[in-house]
């Protein structure tokens, strides 16, 4: 009330992020689940590379102890694009990942069809010259503008995918395959199986934004995860204790 009475403009967070994406190259991660880890991973890959980025994340990065990263020089802004209340419709992405479209927030959307329509509309907001990186096999129909390139990704197939997956002794190594490169023997800093797929999406964003193969490889190995996202608090031969948000529709 004080701010309104004194002439301040008040905006929702999503509206402010929309303003930011109109004045920078927004790298957005949308989807029912996986978006916090994927966006935080992508932000780390870019932040530790020569490309750099600003980032507004939906969780606390364990690498940086914050959900906000700032760069005075990078044109890129990594944003977790939240579909709740259709808030991601305020954004103007340069590139976007869509991780999943399992129906959620039906108190807002009412039906599965309305939920999927919201994602279709979101894809129309991606700016010409940019890209959509769509999880292979989703029910939704993309509707991108002319000049937007659409890629697919998943763990095992798509334009971006993983091969030669090796899991053992608490470690995961993969080869990352992209349309124009292959990065072998990448170690996942957080050796959780779902992070193979999250990592493919994050590496796709970083690669398309100009990070080098070596920067991507080093960044994946040094990624420490997100607070309360499969967060190991205790791990020994007898006990594994995890803290996790544990939200899935």
What are these regions (language model features)?
Residues 2-136, 140-149, 200, 206-207:
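Phosphate-binding loop of NTP-binding sites
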Residues 109-116, 146-249:
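Adenine nucleotide phosphate-binding catalytic loops in nucleotide-utilizing enzymes
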């Amino acid at each position: 009330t004080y701010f309104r009475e004194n002439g301040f403009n008040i905006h929702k967070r999503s509206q402010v992020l929309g303003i930011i994406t109109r004045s920078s190259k927004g790298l957005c991660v949308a989807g029912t689940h996986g978006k916090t880890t994927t966006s935080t991973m992508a932000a780390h890959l870019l932040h530790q590379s020569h490309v750099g980025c600003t980032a507004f994340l939906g969780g606390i990065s364990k690498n940086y102890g914050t959900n906000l990263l700032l760069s005075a020089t990078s044109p890129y802004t990594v944003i977790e694009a939240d579909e709740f209340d259709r808030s991601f419709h305020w954004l103007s992405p340069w590139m976007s990942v869509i991780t999943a479209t399992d129906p959620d927030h039906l108190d807002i959307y009412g039906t599965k069809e309305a939920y999927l329509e919201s994602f279709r509309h979101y894809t129309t907001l991606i700016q010409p010259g940019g890209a959509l990186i769509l999880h292979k096999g989703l029910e939704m129909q993309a509707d991108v503008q002319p000049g937007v390139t659409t890629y697919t990704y998943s763990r095992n197939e798509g334009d971006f995918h993983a091969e030669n997956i090796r899991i053992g002794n608490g470690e995961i190594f993969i080869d990352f395959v992209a349309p124009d490169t292959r990065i072998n023997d990448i170690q996942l800093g957080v050796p959780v199986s779902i992070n193979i797929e999250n990592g493919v999406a994050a590496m796709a964003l970083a690669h398309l934004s100009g990070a080098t193969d070596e920067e991507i490889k080093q960044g994946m190995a040094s990624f420490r995860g997100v607070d309360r996202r499969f967060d190991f608090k205790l791990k020994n031969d007898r006990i594994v204790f995890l803290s996790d948000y544990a939200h899935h529709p």
